[in-house]
Structures are given as structure tokens and as C-alpha cells.
Amino acid sequence: MKNLTVKYMGLALKNPIVAASSGLTSSLKGIKALEDSGVGAVVIKSLFEEEIIMETQDSMNRMQATGFIYPETMEYFDFDEIEDPVANYIKLISDAKREVNIPVIASINCVTAHKWPDFAKRIQEAGADALELNIFALPSDFNRTAEENEKLYFDIIERVTSLVSIPVAVKISHYNASLASFLKRLSETPIKSIVLFNRFYNPDID
């Protein structure tokens, strides 16, 4: 049999097939099935910042409507509301590392540089072999320049790589004013891989 072993982000893979972040990698059962199918590594389904923000905002709106909101509530939502999905994600990483023998790569979908560096550290502590930062800056703000959108990537990379020692990859959007130059500058940061491109659902006409 041919030797298909490769190195990706410094990780030894038995073959170059990596199961991308998706519904297939969102559960331990799915991850084990992918290993049984022969993949070389898995990227766990992304932890989405937008979903956590929306859940938190919905809860705050409900509390505000019924008059149950106080200044200290902001502290509560800063941690407790975010903790539940993050804790579940950390558990999935730990369980996967215990059950499978292929590299397990965590994935964070970021739109800000606020909390994610701290979460990245916890992901490393849970045993993830590497981390994929799925960064997206929607180019729809008339007051935000292309340079400001790109700066978000570098801010997140700088903060995360200063806190973790596991390999870090960045998955980028195809919305770039100068893709070649942007890729070159990303390659000069401490990240170990650039993934092209993240995929977002678009409206369609039936």
C-alpha cells in the first residue's frame, strides 16, 4: 500500500484527507465514524461567536421586558451565558481526544477579538491538537475601511498565538481587496496554515 502520511501544521497525518468543520464533526459519534472511514484528521464544527451573542441578546431582551435587569446583569451575561456552549465544546474536544487516534483540530468562528483568545487557551487545555480560527469581517459597513477589516485578522492572530502553543490556522473569507498581498502578510505571522475559503450561506431564488 502507498505511504500517504503527510505533515499538516506540524501534525503527523496518516493521509492528507481532513474532515472540515461541519455537521459531521459536531458530535463524538460523527467524529468516530469519520475516523473509521479513514480520514487523517478532523476539524470540529466551529464554535460560533454570532450564535452566542444572539442567545445572550435574546435572554437580555426578555429580562429587560419583564423588568428583571440590573447593572450586575452585564457581568452575569459576560460569563454565565457564554459558559454553557463553550463548556459543551470543551467537553466534545476532551471526549474526542480520548476516543480517537487522529488529530483533533478545534475551530472558532470569530467576528471580534474580544473573548476568543481566552477561549483558545481553554481549547488547548482540553487537548486539541491544533486550532483553526475561522475569521469573518462582513464588508458591509460604509464607515469601515478595507484596512480596518484586515486588521481584525491580525489582532486576533496576535492575541491567540501569544496565549497558545498549539499550531494555529486561519480560515479566511474571499472578501478581500488584495488577496495575494493579504495572504503574504498572513504568512508572515506565527500561524501555521491558511485555509481558503470559509463558506457562508447566501440567499437564493427558487
Name what the model sees in each region.
Residues 18-22, 81-83, 172-173:
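Short, flexible loop segments at the rims of nucleotide/cofactor-binding pockets, characterized by
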Residues 9, 15-33:
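N-terminal binding-site loop/beta-alpha segment at the start of enzyme catalytic domains
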Residues 28-68, 84-105, 109-206:
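Alpha/beta enzyme core
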Residues 1-18, 89-97:
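N-terminal amphipathic alpha-helix/helix-capping segment at the start of soluble metabolic enzymes
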Residues 1, 9, 54, 60-63, ...:
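Detector for methionine-enriched segments
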Residues 71-80:
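Short glycine/proline- and acidic residue-enriched helix-loop micro-motifs
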